[in-house]
Amino acid sequence: MIKYALVGDVGGTNARLALCDIASGEISQAKTYSGLDYPSLEAVIRVYLEEHKVEVKDGCIAIACPITGDWVAMTNHTWAFSIAEMKKNLGFSHLEIINDFTAVSMAIPMLKKEHLIQFGGAEPVEGKPIAVYGAGTGLGVAHLVHVDKRWVSLPGEGGHVDFAPNSEEEAIILEILRAEIGHVSAERVLSGPGLVNLYRAIVKADNRLPENLKPKDITERALADSCTDCRRALSLFCVIMGRFGGNLALNLGTFGGVFIAGGIVPRFLEFFKASGFRAAFEDKGRFKEYVHDIPVYLIVHDNPGLLGSGAHLRQTLGHIL
């Protein structure tokens, strides 16, 4: 008989839940719920388990916020809870709550070739560190290392490091944004809102008034080639993505690969392929040769958060990935 665990990927808007075959790691019965419709994460879990008529005793939920102890308060949602209390209330034997990019990083060992698109570099070196980052509502970052037959995810808040410009245009962008918001983190330019910031700064640098555009508007106009400012913003976004990825590669010597997750880049894949991304990734001065062979991959799996939550839980329960 198949033994299932509950896995989840919870953001500021939606909660996506599924079942994970503990033996194989296969994900099934995925369903998305609007977080606005439920008073708590526990309530959503109860509805899911009732709808699917399944009893589970183990679970792992990935959440888009820092996890530093038993009390979890979501960054972009009103939900807050005690992990120990929810585990007890649900009657679980084991409940893990992890950061969303911890989950994405743990998905990487489970991905197949068809789940990845490579952007330059050579083959990954087995056993070497891995970096993963992705732009969405914010900028998520994690690293992954292999130690004693176990994968260890190194989460953090790397999206909030300083934005480090390396061209005259980028320096002007920094100056304009710093005057508006003070500290300018990488997330302020590498995210959905960050794309808007880039567009606004480009227009303001020319002493013009920017339109009130959303990230989707900027992307659509750039791809249609109907707005020079939007196209410049999207091009610059790709370049800064490259610079940031190259920095991650240098930090930990990620010869196991640098992986891009998140929902933004797949929306303009062909544009991204033709952009200055890879050149910027390798633009490291004296260390250009060092990063030259490090491969970069775009993750195109539908649910890396669910896959990684399952992988994390299975490893915690003693399985070798």
UniProtKB/Swiss-Prot annotation:
EC number, UniProt record: 2.7.1.2
What is the annotated localization of this protein?
Cytoplasm
- What reaction is this protein's catalytic activity? D-glucose + ATP = D-glucose 6-phosphate + ADP + H(+)
Query: At which positions is ATP bound?
Result: G8, D9, V10, G11, G12, T13
Annotated GO molecular function terms are: ATP binding; D-glucose binding; glucokinase activity
An example Gene Ontology CC term for this record: cytosol
Q: Which Pfam families match?
A: Glucokinase
Q: Name one GO biological process term.
A: glycolytic process
Keyword check for Cytoplasm: yes
Decide whether keyword Transferase is in the record: yes
Q: Which UniProt keywords apply?
A: ATP-binding, Cytoplasm, Glycolysis, Kinase, Nucleotide-binding, Transferase
Q: Which family does it belong to?
A: Belongs to the bacterial glucokinase family.
The record's NCBIfam families line, in alphabetical order, gives:
glk, PRK00292.1-1, PRK00292.1-3
Q: Kindly provide the name given to this protein in its UniProt entry.
A: Glucokinase
Q: Which organism is it from?
A: Shigella boydii serotype 18 (strain CDC 3083-94 / BS512)
